[in-house]
């Protein structure tokens, strides 16, 4: 039976209409799936990533931001053995004399060293302008003594670097400034920085009991009351004052001069693998082996610029980090990272991994300290 014109037109109009579009929901992102998981699993995933990615990941969601800011993530990183060595730097402005704390941030997405920057830590607690003793132990930084309003103080505090939170320590028995410090056998030793006739010339803070006790040792009038640098190596504490170098034995309570240390040791120095690295004579980096009792030049770095004055060194995960002013009075701070390698004959060689300006300040500043913390 033939179709009528009306029915034909109706069929034609139906055939010409485009089929309805299917509604497709946007595919959920990987982060959306991850957010459906319990916090414990998300935390475990985040803890496995390098810290340099955390600022970017924090922008993804409130959950990521909350977990990355929590102290639990650093506990998880420690359990997973994913901790990293982070460089902390104290700069003091020539204009205000106020110390400020910074961290060296290694940017993700490439190995371009121009991305490495010193970043200020706004939440870091203020410290005395002069004379404080600073030492890093694992993930914490201890700040002891110093001068406030022209008076030496006996107070101290510790900063938990993963969260940048601060807690006060019990006061030392003796107020002191520019004291030598060294961590040994669970105790933090503080030496000098006060009247050499004080009965508490040496004190030890027990990290387990959180108490101070007088340390072994006789008063030493030969050592200047202001020390410049100190390190704990094995079971001894090496001390530099304004004139001489000394070695303190906490077990025996003895303090002896070390003339060999005096020949090269300078303020800008650090300890790596039980050896002291320092800028010494002829603008060379020298290495002191306390067991062999010998200084030796770090090989392979004959063209380093003369940066002995005002530079600071630190152990950056087994590499040597050097922080220095670009030139005297400059507002530019530079950093150089050197890989260390022991070759035939026991000689230590250095290779520059990168070197560039890491911050430009508003006014010239002094590099007070460089130290590395595990987080």
UniProtKB/Swiss-Prot annotation:
Keyword Repeat tagged: yes
Annotated region described as Disordered, given as residue ranges: 1-27
Composition bias type Low complexity, residue spans: 1-15
Family matches, as InterPro entries: F-box-like_dom_sf, F-box/kelch-repeat_ARATH, F-box_dom, Kelch-typ_b-propeller, Kelch_1
Keywords annotated in UniProt: Kelch repeat, Repeat
Domain spans labelled F-box: 31-77
Keyword Transferase included in the entry's annotation: no
Highest taxon above the source species: Eukaryota
Kelch repeats (start-end): 140-186, 187-232, 275-321
PANTHER family the record matches: F-BOX DOMAIN-CONTAINING PROTEIN, F-BOX/KELCH-REPEAT PROTEIN SKIP4
Entry protein name: F-box/kelch-repeat protein At4g39240
Species: Arabidopsis thaliana
């Amino acid at each position: 039976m033939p179709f009528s014109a009306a029915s034909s037109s109706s069929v034609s109009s139906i055939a010409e209409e485009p089929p309805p579009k299917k509604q497709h929901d946007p595919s959920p992102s990987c982060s959306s799936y991850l957010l459906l998981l319990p916090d414990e699993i998300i935390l475990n995933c985040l803890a496995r990533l390098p810290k340099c990615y955390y600022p970017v990941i924090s922008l993804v969601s409130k959950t990521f931001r909350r977990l990355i800011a929590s102290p639990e993530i650093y506990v998880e990183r420690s359990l997973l053995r994913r901790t990293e060595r982070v460089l902390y730097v104290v700069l003091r402005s020539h204009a205000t004399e106020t110390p400020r704390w910074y961290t060296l941030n290694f940017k993700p997405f490439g190995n371009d060293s121009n991305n490495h920057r010193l970043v200020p830590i706004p939440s870091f607690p203020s410290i005395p302008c002069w004379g404080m003793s600073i030492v890093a132990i694992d993930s914490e930084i201890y700040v002891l003594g110093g001068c406030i309003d022209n008076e030496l103080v006996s107070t101290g505090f510790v900063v938990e670097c993963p969260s940048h939170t601060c807690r006060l320590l019990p006061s030392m028995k003796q107020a002191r400034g520019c004291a030598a410090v060294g961590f040994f056998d669970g105790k933090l030793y503080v030496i000098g920085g006060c009247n050499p006739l004080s009965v508490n010339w040496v004190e030890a803070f027990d990290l387990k009991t959180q108490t101070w006790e007088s340390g072994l040792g006789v008063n030493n009038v030969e050592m200047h009351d202001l020390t410049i640098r100190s390190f704990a190596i094995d079971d001894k504490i090496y001390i530099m004052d304004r004139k001489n170098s000394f070695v303190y034995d906490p077990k025996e309570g003895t303090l002896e001069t070390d003339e060999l240390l005096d020949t090269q040791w300078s303020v800008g120095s650090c300890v790596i693998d039980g050896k002291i690295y320092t800028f010494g004579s002829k603008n060379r980096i020298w290495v002191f082996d306390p067991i062999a009792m010998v200084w030796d030049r770090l090989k392979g770095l004959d063209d380093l610029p003369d940066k002995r004055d005002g530079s600071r060194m630190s152990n950056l995960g087994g590499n040597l980090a050097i922080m220095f002013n670009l030139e005297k009075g400059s507002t530019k701070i530079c950093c150089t990272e050197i890989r260390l390698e022991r070759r035939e004959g026991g000689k230590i060689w250095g290779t520059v991994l990168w070197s560039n300006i890491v911050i430009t300040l508003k006014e010239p500043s002094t590099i007070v300290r460089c130290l590395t913390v595990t987080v």
